[in-house]
Amino acid sequence: MSKLNKKTFFIILLLSSLVSCSTFDSLRFWSNDDDVDPDEPKELLSFNEQRNINIEWDISFNGVNDLGSFKPGFSSENLFFADAEGNLISVQSSTGKENWKKQLNFLSSGVASGFGILVVSDIKGNVIALNQNDGSEIWSTNVKGEVLSTAAIDPKTVVVKTGSGELIGLEKTSGETLWSYRSKLPTLTIRGSSSPVIFDNNVFVTFDNGRLGVFDINSGFLLWDGAISYVSGTSELDNLIDADADPVVDGGLVYTTNYQGKLNIFDIAQKRSVWSYDVSSFFSPVVSRGMIIVSESNSNIKSFSAKSLEESWSNEDYLNRELSNPASFKGNLVFGDFEGYLHVIDPLNGKTIGRKKISKKPIKTLFSRSNSLYAIDEAFNLFSVSI
């Protein structure tokens, strides 16, 4: 099983499209001014500003955040964040003032926080639990595989998923392995991984084979699963259907997306898919204000009525601008892009109502909590933002 990071994957995809062209004229790289390259990032359009964006504080870390998999953890009034070089810090979420910091080995994923502990994973396959108060190590367990996504924590169990598709339950106080499940992976996958989600004593997780699995958290027993989409191409690239987005559990339903696949809604009680729509996405959908909103892999944004499931609006203003994950914040929809902009969109009509450039680097991840929105760029700069 081979892993491609997203940048490498898109380069390969571009090269394969060039090889298929029979003449240089068909490439049209130097054609007249009336021609528009459909793969070029769309220029930003003017808009009617209704929201102001302000940076409350920012902290710079080390390394390259190319996958956007490093997310902050929270507990009470504190924020915990780590970079790829193992710098772990606790700060006051309102001011950014440092509480404590700790140096760890090179890390492969961000910080999970819950029930008095922090959990991180390093590049050697070690899952490490630390005390939230001072960063002291509680336990470390090697799971024999790199963990590329944030762990999930409940009162008794820490759940992690490795890049090789293994889901593992660890005892929260000791790190002892309680159970494991290995999914069947395709030959080629995109380097990235969704995080498990714990809800009502069950673990919901999506895999690189394009399936959703639901497990009992105590035993690791597979309760039910279903395909988000099926392969339909003739080549390995065509058959990439990685589900790198965390499932969203809301109102008895599970919302899932995958690459070159679908937005698929599963009913938990019925244990099956009840609706799907063809999309290609690396990000979890946003379910907010009666809308289901998904950012596609080409940065087109689509929305659906959560009640009727009919398509509502579509926004192509940000095509190929490498949008970050969407975040719902104070009734707004927020995205980052490859030029370091934050964009605020009205989720009811898809219109842009706010914008600000906060970084010289691409914005990779957005995370909202309480009255603050947090943005993380490719250079591991962490911004606390208010709107």
Which functions belong to the PLM regions below?
Residues S2-F9:
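Bacterial N-terminal signal peptides that target proteins for export
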Residues D25-R28, D35-D39, N48-G73, E98-F115, ...:
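Extracytoplasmic beta-rich repeat domains
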Residues D83-A84, D122-I123, T162-G163, F207-D208, ...:
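Structural signature of WD-repeat beta-propellers
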Residues Q92-T95, N131-D134, E171-G175, D216-G220, ...:
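Short loop/turn segments that connect beta-strands within beta-propeller blades
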Residues V294-K302, E310-V344:
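Loop/turn-rich, solvent-exposed surfaces of beta-rich toroidal or solenoidal domains
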